[in-house]
Amino acid sequence: MPYDATSPSASTRPLSRRQFVAGAAAATGALTTASLLAAESDRPQAAPPAEPRKITRKLKLGLIGCGGRGQWIAGLCTEHGGFTTHAVADYFEDVALSVGDKLGVDKARRFSGLSGYKRLLESGVEAVAIEDVPYFYPEQAKAAVDAGVHVYLAKPVAVDVPGTVLIGEAGKLATQKNVCFLVDYQLPTDPAIIEIGNRVRAGALGPMAHISSIGFGWQGWPDPPLDKTIASRLQGQIWLSDTALSGDTIVSYDIHIIDGLLAVTGRHPVAACGRARTCRPNPNGDRTDVAAVIYEQEDGVIWTHVTQAITNNFDVTTLSASIFGMKATAHVRYDGKVYIRGGDKHYVGNVTNVFQEGVKRNIANFYGSITEGRFDNSTVQRAVDGHLTAILGREAAARRCYLTMEELLRENKRLTVDLTGLQA
């Protein structure tokens, strides 16, 4: 099924996404030299150039989901040099055939329908890139691991608690079976974000006070009238307007900054409360348009998060967050200036083109992990934690209640989709 990603790394028009996250924040007010400059050891250092990995063999890659992002990922895998696209699968037969032509895939290995991915897994692939509609990710990823096939998985990895838990179990099983399972988040791979995370976790901010984050989708997702089946909603970006298919905006888009915050701070919420509303006229899908969530961490630290999916010319920096300590503040974002200001561990860096460079790093890491036998699969557990955090916020805001993580897990609520009338 086509996957037109909700990340700022959306495949077909990356620059349009970037317009909403580009640029560094301008400094305001006069600051003394002492407040601007850190000790030599605290100044930002240029990231060392990555050592080129040796391409020891070509891996046969299967592409599940042939939308814009899927095609883009397959192209970057080919550009890397360690992969050849061996098979493709998409719900829509015409899409599978067309993309198969573009990628030079034998016609016998172009599969369609809901179960097309199963035939792909039997076609001789060694690895899969799953870029489909998120509702199907847990089932597809688990099937790949069961088949001994390495998994490169897009976000969001799941839309509900049972699916998220299944992803975690699949990651653990993959490690046991010497199978690589990598979740494609870009922000935590950036050298500046890694450095800020190291300093924050080392106490750079002092005792934590509060956290604030923003996740504004770059537009209101398309939401045409419903048909007799959901087939039409499995293409373009329409699935983003259906919570069961996408997880809602806080899960499908905001997860970038939520995951980034978990990576930087190493902290997880234990409860949340919030409010959400749908304000677009004549909604067809059930996604929310705006929501505000207050997360509570175990030690009482609060984290406020605001999200929206409206085309309204907003001027805030989407996918950004500030982490406020008692002696210093850190600011992180998907693109632009990032820093720690105050205290004794000042740092200023810049996140540049993480949309593409992060994916390239992940593809290289995926290949290296497979060929060098590294199967710790460390990205999976953080993805599970991030998704549970996003789902907790979604549910608390939708229900307008105080909800604990323990209650969310115990409830184990499953989202369902009516697949009646779809091609098997």
Question: What does each of the following model-derived ranges do?
Answer:
Residues G65, Q176-L182, L187-G285, V293-Y295, ...:
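Predominantly a Rossmann-like dinucleotide-binding segment in NAD(P)-dependent oxidoreductases
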Residues G23-L31, S35, W72, S252, ...:
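C-terminal helical cap and adjacent loop that interface with cofactors, partners, or active-site loops
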Residues E126-A127, V133, P138-P188, G203:
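Beta-strand-loop-alpha-helix segment that lines the small-molecule cofactor/substrate pocket
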Residues Y295-D299, G325:
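Active-site beta-strand termini and strand-to-loop segments that position acidic
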Residues M1-L15:
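N-terminal secretory signal peptides
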Residues R109-E126, I130:
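A structured beta-alpha segment of the ubiquitous adenosine-cofactor-binding alpha/beta core
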Residues A27, L31-L103:
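N-terminal Rossmann-like dinucleotide-binding module
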